[in-house]
């Protein structure tokens, strides 16, 4: 994995191989960042955030078959609230994800998102 300058990673965080975390980002405790995740600069990942790369596309776990995994890309200046779940998506720059949200689709416009599934609440 690659972790940029001036980052903070809290206790009990699992960061799997191949993950990229940009400079000045913070990852709070008990978060899980699986393979194929890239996080931009100046991001905040709250406590207990889970990133998922296996969508169980054929009704069962990929069982290590990486061809079934999908990537997640988080832009710059993104804040993700505690206990959010991020499926394989692209999140643009300047986004806030509320605590407990489940992000199931790409986020292409800056703003505040929350809920299950996450939806846009407002612009900045």
Regions found by a protein language model. Give the residues of each.
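C-terminal/domain-terminus segments
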Residues: 94-103, 112
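Acidic, glycine-centered active-site loop in nucleotide-sugar glycosyltransferases
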Residues: 109, 114-117
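Conserved beta-to-alpha transition
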Residues: 108-109, 124
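Flexible, glycine/small-residue-enriched loop-and-beta-strand segment within the central core
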Residues: 1-91, 117, 124
């Amino acid at each position: 994995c690659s972790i940029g300058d001036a980052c903070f990673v809290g206790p009990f965080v699992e960061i799997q191989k191949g993950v990229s975390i940009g400079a000045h980002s913070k990852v709070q405790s008990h978060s899980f960042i699986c393979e194929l995740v890239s996080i931009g600069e100046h991001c905040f990942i709250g406590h207990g955030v889970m990133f998922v790369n296996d969508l169980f596309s054929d009704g069962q776990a990929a069982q290590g078959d990486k061809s079934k995994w999908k990537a997640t890309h988080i832009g710059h200046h993104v804040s993700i609230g505690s206990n959010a779940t991020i499926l394989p998506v692209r999140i643009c720059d300047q986004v806030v994800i509320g605590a407990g949200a489940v992000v199931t689709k790409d986020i292409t416009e800056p703003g505040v998102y929350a809920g299950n599934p996450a939806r846009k609440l407002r612009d900045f």
